[in-house]
Amino acid sequence: MIIVTGGAGFIGSNIIKALNQGGREDILVVDDLTQGEKFSNLIDCEIWDYWDKQPFLQAIKAGEEFPHPVDAFIHQGACSATTEWNGRYMMENNFYYSKRLLHYCLERRIPFLYASSAAVYGCGLTFQEHREFEAPRNVYGYSKWLFDQYVRRYLPTASSQIVGLRYFNIYGPREAHKGAMASVAYHAHCQLKETGRIKLFEGCDGYEHGEQRRDFVSVADAAAVNLWFLEHPNQSGIFNVGTGQAQTFNEVAQAVLAFHGHGEIEYIPFPDHLRGRYQSFTQADIHALREAGYAEPFALVEKGVKTYLDWLGKNQD
């Protein structure tokens, strides 16, 4: 059995779908469906059981065993809102929760894969998995970074796999429930359908309008990385998950415009509250991931966005 926390969420549900496509259906999904619309992410997924987060966490704290042997934990459950500033809430969901799962797995030698984030790098320009390049600029990034730091203490002596995956800007199917935190591609698609225009920020930090750059990575590629590590339990560490190539917001918008065959871009003023906290440039250094043995190519925006919009047309529009 594989346990996927946050399994009804964006990345978690895509990992479950990928596991299904590989023949795995013995999956225990853990989530909090207070936001009930997330259930739709699991409609076409095959799972063994569903547990609410609270009784699951109580079982973990009590050291209870599960009804079936656990092959791995894939921990995607977290508060992923970069605009959330309730530090107590963020630390409980992203740090303390993760620590409890880590120790449960270490004590039983169960592989533990978890979601980290490119937010740990803050506004820096070097994106390598080393302490000197890490300086988060919001409490979300700090909660992820602090758990990475905690994991680093255990990596040298752990007798079972621990893998932290620092996701860059993920986009793709099953993200509609994320609202304002959904991807640029998703918002561009929705805006174009509703108004015929795509809104992007004006220039900032020395970048021209819409020329801010991010490493946009398909959720299908992120799921594939998770499955690869499941298949290679001798590989442990903290790894960036991105294409390794920054692309502009304009390129994302142009990919959406090209798919629909109409529309235009409207540039709007850059919000004052984001100044000094906004990542105008991200580009994953994926040397560590490649050195670990992951050799699959990553889709760039031109291909990945088209594939995504094809899916939206068949499943949501």
Curated annotation (Swiss-Prot):
Cofactor binding, note field: Binds 1 NADP(+) per subunit.
Annotated NADP(+) binding sites: 10-11, 31-32, 38, 53, 76-80, 93, 144, 170, 178
Catalytic activity, reaction form: ADP-D-glycero-beta-D-manno-heptose = ADP-L-glycero-beta-D-manno-heptose
GO molecular function, one term: ADP-glyceromanno-heptose 6-epimerase activity
EC number: 5.1.3.20
Recorded metabolic or biological pathway in which this protein acts: Nucleotide-sugar biosynthesis; ADP-L-glycero-beta-D-manno-heptose biosynthesis; ADP-L-glycero-beta-D-manno-heptose from D-glycero-beta-D-manno-heptose 7-phosphate: step 4/4
Active site annotation, chain numbering: Y140, K178
Function, as annotated: Catalyzes the interconversion between ADP-D-glycero-beta-D-manno-heptose and ADP-L-glycero-beta-D-manno-heptose via an epimerization at carbon 6 of the heptose.
HAMAP family in alphabetical order: Heptose_epimerase (MF_01601)
Family under the similarity heading: Belongs to the NAD(P)-dependent epimerase/dehydratase family. HldD subfamily.
Name of this chain's protein: ADP-L-glycero-D-manno-heptose-6-epimerase
